[in-house]
């Protein structure tokens, strides 16, 4: 019995380490993806709506083996409109994010998009009727205060483009809320397949409306790389959550901030201002507090 307990204790930490490693690798892949996306939209001036289409279109192609394994039968659902709404919101979030990367430095964009959990809390209270205690409201207020410090709306240099990462956080938060409402009544495979199948045509429609652009030469190669990085990063996320509890691996997702700051400095020479770290500290602290609070709530007996 003693040997079995020791074996069990040895296995659990190893799974936790593997989960953390996959999450860090996902963060690195997303950081490189953001560099490629910003290079395409900012340096090469490729239209952002078309950029979103090509990036996720190629990601869809790279995801076809996964989709084939699941089969289109996984799309069977009693809630098609709910799925359609969440994917439309996710697609609009992608459009806002890519347009944001075309206009603002990576470090600012990634810090602001990390406000998404706070929009989820607001939405959970308003639309799902979840109870939100004073501590969670305080954490949400702290997170938005951090975002305001980074945005500096009182500055003369603030432009509408700086709000795009916040808009993407709002849209992705709304999409996550609908996903949350589906997790108890739908299979994970169904939720995943609907996203994979619908995201590309929706992005395609938005690209056509904005003036469709076709990449060639080196630009096409960069979009292939962006699609591959998107598929790989999402796959690494799946492996992370499969290896260990989400509550354990989620804090490692916050490493995306320093990883993106480093990537922005290496490839674009961005040197973030000191106020970034103050605002980011508020956002990170509030996010970690909310996560720990959620863990305690889930562990309470019904």
Curated annotation (Swiss-Prot):
Induction: Negatively regulated by riboflavin, probably via an FMN riboswitch.
Keyword Transport: yes
EamA domain: residues covered: 30-151, 170-291
Compartmental location: Cell membrane
InterPro entries: EamA_dom
Keyword RNA-binding: no
Protein name, per record: Riboflavin transporter
Organism per entry: Rhizobium johnstonii (strain DSM 114642 / LMG 32736 / 3841) (Rhizobium leguminosarum bv. viciae)
């Amino acid at each position: 019995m003693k040997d079995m307990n020791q074996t069990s204790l040895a296995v659990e930490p190893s799974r936790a380490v593997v989960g953390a490693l996959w999450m860090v690798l996902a963060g690195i892949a997303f950081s490189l993806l953001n560099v490629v996306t910003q290079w395409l939209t900012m340096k090469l001036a490729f239209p952002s709506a078309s950029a979103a289409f090509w990036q996720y279109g190629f990601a869809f192609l790279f995801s076809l083996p996964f989709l084939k394994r699941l089969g289109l039968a996984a799309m069977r659902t009693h809630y098609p409109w709910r799925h359609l709404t969440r994917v439309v919101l996710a697609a609009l979030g992608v459009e806002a994010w890519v347009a944001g990367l075309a206009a603002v430095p990576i470090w600012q964009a990634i810090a602001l998009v990390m406000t998404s959990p706070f929009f989820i809390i607001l939405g959970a209270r308003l639309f799902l009727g979840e109870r939100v205690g004073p501590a969670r409201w305080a954490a949400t207020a702290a997170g938005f205060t951090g975002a305001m410090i980074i945005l500096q709306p009182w500055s003369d240099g603030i432009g509408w483009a700086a709000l795009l990462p916040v808009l993407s956080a709002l849209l992705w938060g709304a999409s996550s809320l609908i996903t949350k409402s589906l997790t108890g009544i739908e299979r994970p495979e169904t939720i995943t397949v609907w996203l994979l199948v619908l995201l590309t045509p929706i992005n395609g429609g938005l690209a056509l409306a904005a003036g469709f652009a076709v990449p060639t030469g080196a630009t096409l190669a960069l979009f292939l790389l962006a699609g591959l990085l998107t598929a790989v990063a999402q796959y690494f996320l799946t492996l992370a959550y499969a290896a260990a509890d989400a509550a354990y691996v989620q804090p490692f997702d916050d490493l995306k901030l320093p990883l993106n700051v480093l990537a922005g400095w290496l490839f674009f020479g961005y040197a973030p201002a000191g106020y970034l770290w103050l605002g980011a500290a508020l956002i990170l602290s509030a996010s970690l507090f909310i996560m720990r609070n959620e863990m305690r709530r889930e562990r309470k007996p019904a």
